[in-house]
A protein has these predicted regions:
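Acidic, Ser/Pro/Thr-rich low-complexity regulatory regions
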Residues: 1-112
Length: 112
């Protein structure tokens, strides 16, 4: 478990609403892509229903915003391309280095 400083925690809580809205915007664009497919309306409906339910589940898991889960939430936003490591430049060097290390380790696992 990581304990980041109070400044990082306050900055995270400040940026969180913007990041969440960016994530919702990304999801809405993806939903529009599903609706715009050249398939049967019922197929689009059920595909969208399945996708929304899956996204709701992930959002509920991420809804556990606490200082002890801050790194997990940040990595989730990075993994889903809501933010990048550059969005963390205002955070402490410790947090930035920690996130960079996690991204490097997990990209090795997922990429190869």
């Amino acid at each position: 478990m990581n304990t980041f400083n109070e400044k990082d925690w306050k900055l995270f809580r400040e940026k969180l609403p913007q990041w969440q809205e960016s994530h919702m915007e990304k999801l809405c664009r993806e939903y529009l892509e599903i609706l715009g497919k050249d398939t049967q309306p019922s197929d689009r409906f059920w595909e969208l229903d399945k996708r929304i339910n899956s996204d709701k589940h992930h959002l509920e898991l991420r809804g556990r915003m606490s200082r002890s889960n801050m790194d997990i939430n940040i990595i989730g936003f990075i993994r889903e391309n809501v933010i990048t490591l550059d969005d963390l430049l205002e955070f402490s060097d410790e947090l930035q280095n920690h996130m960079r290390l996690i991204v490097e380790r997990t990209s090795m696992v997922f990429d190869g």
